[in-house]
Amino acid sequence: MDFMTIFFLIIGFVLLIKGADYLVDGASAVAKRFGIPDIIIGLTVVSMGTSAPELVVSVGSAMQGSTGLVFANVIGSNISNTCLILGVAGLIVPLVVQSTTVKYELPLSILIIPLLFVLSNDAMLWGAQESTLSRIDGFILLTLFVGFLYYVFRSAKNNPDEVEVIDPLPAWKSAIYIVGGIAGLIIGGDWVVSSAKEIATTFGMTERLVGLTVVAVGTSLPELATSVVAAMKRNSDIAIGNVVGSNIFNVLLVLGTSAAIMPTNYELAINFDLYFLMAVSFLLFAFFFVGTLRKESLYTLDRWEAALLLIAIISYFTYIIVNDPGTAAAVG
């Protein structure tokens, strides 16, 4: 590995993030021109755009045979969303969230974790020769995703003020944004996957470790920026809703699409990461309910709780780096 590998990794992340932004802007403007309501655009094009980097990286990894990156990217992104993003945002200002997020969306983001465990662990649970997230599993996840979209659509109809208003663009600019966005996603995704594999090979790291750390944090940068800005503007609902929604999209849409296109082998080592994701998701859920005991029924994430989330992810990263088979062999 040389300097160019790091360069292509960084540029790949930039292309992924900006490509998603341009694709969302262009597609939203086109949809607006066809008279599609803002509520539909916001819940489909805009929402899916935040998960576009994870989707491109996971599908690209599956097609290149890098199965370790497929699951590690999604699970690592959800861990980063929960601990890193909410940890940073919660340190800026205590976060207050709507009751519907705590009662419905957050529990769903927790429940799909054991579902993914059951769908993926064929060898452990059913005695199969290998564990695979099959096309059928992918369609199950996508079906649940459609159901989730329907629920969000119904909820948004009751709260139209919370839906982002889409500004139209000239037709020529929309076309450039769409083409440029797709190109950025494709090229950026390829560079990120290739660079991540090169880093893993050079340092003797497993693809799982690179996916859980470098790739996961990199693809979570849009959510980090959105949530930090929202926290600074005292828009706690956006900060938390952005993270919870992204976690649901990543599992149901990203892994669902990836498996539907290319069935993916599942590594047993990923179970530890699923357990950790489940634990910190429950911890976040508990933090909000602790807030109701102190603050007159407000669901709150205080600064000390945000600090605990940051400590959790630092401890997690330290553990998986020290115990990664590749790094352990290199040290030994």
Question: Where do the language-model regions lie?
Answer:
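Hydrophobic alpha-helical segments, chiefly the membrane-spanning helices
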Residues: 1-332
